[in-house]
Amino acid sequence: MAVSKTLQELADYLGGTLVGDGSRQIVGVASLDDATDSQITFLANPRYAPKVASTRAGAVILPPGAERHNHNAIMVPNPYLAFARLLTLFYVAPRAARGVMDGAHVGRNVKLGSEITIHPGAVVGDNVTIGDRVTLHPGVVLYEGVTVGDDVTLHANVTVYQGCRIGNRVTIHGGTIIGSDGFGYAPDGDGWYKIPQLGNVVIEDDVEIGANAAIDRAALASTVIGKGTKVDNLVMIAHNCVIGENCMIVSQVGISGSTKLGRRVTLGGQVGVAGHLEIGDNAMIGAKSGVPGNVPSGTIMSGIPAFDHREWLRASAVVPKLPEMKRTVAALEKRLRELEEKLESAV
């Protein structure tokens, strides 16, 4: 069903300041380029400020002090967050519970909450507990003893191994594996002896995990993904890692075993982190970096191996000049040799 709101209603919803016609009806959200006079748009990046003048939008979400060019406007401190909230308001439909559908398998001693949907092809093992308003899409597999909280969505082909715990308001996207064995082997002569992985994975509240990620169970105790953390597609988190609250882990990151991340840590795409390390609160690691040691809180690092980001920028600026520098050094060495030969012949 289409949603229509007045600008005044939207301003109240966002907690912003309305400038213009509060009775204007808005039916959707679009970009500065594509918005029509019945849609609202936003300016989050100053480089796009010139487009505000030419947009056809019925209203613009702007930061305080921005030029509105006679458009209706809602002024908010964080236009990007306001944009996200409006997308939820206009386009995210309420879920409709459908119960346990034909073709789903539910094991013994399973506790099911209210308003759930278990799609055909989903498998729920014995002694599983599922909270309220949970959706399990086709191909989801919950091994024995899994616990799932309220308002959880597991997309197609997610697998959660035995004994793992998923908190409230968690979303896990297709193909992700939670709780497979950690990569643990003891040297045994010329071979390797598998170390039984007896722990589990704990996913705390308000976590979102992308597609085809893998989070291994602990050898003992738990691998933990902290409250509010967001994990992108194709991320690997090894056994016994503890990820703090509200971290941001971007695609193709690999975190080796027993590493601990503090709160609000950001790891850029393809970062590799060695095992048994600690990365402090609010640290940021640039894309493709290799982290071989502990990282203090608040540090920004880049490079292989990772070091201070500002120093890395300076070092990176030198790299394209290395061929020229090599030629210059070779020429200087040649001149030095010639001078030495002249001095020797003059003696």
Curated annotation (Swiss-Prot):
Keywords: Acyltransferase, Lipid A biosynthesis, Lipid biosynthesis, Lipid metabolism, Repeat, Transferase. Pfam families: Hexapep, Hexapep_2, LpxD. The active site is at 239 (proton acceptor). It is an enzyme of class 2 (transferase). Pathway: Bacterial outer membrane biogenesis; LPS lipid A biosynthesis. GO terms for cellular component: membrane. It comes from the Bacteria. Homotrimer. NCBIfam families: lipid_A_lpxD, PRK00892.1. Belongs to the transferase hexapeptide repeat family. LpxD subfamily. Catalyzes the N-acylation of UDP-3-O-acylglucosamine using 3-hydroxyacyl-ACP as the acyl donor. Is involved in the biosynthesis of lipid A, a phosphorylated glycolipid that anchors the lipopolysaccharide to the outer membrane of the cell. This is UDP-3-O-acylglucosamine N-acyltransferase. It comes from Geobacter sulfurreducens (strain ATCC 51573 / DSM 12127 / PCA). The gene is lpxD.
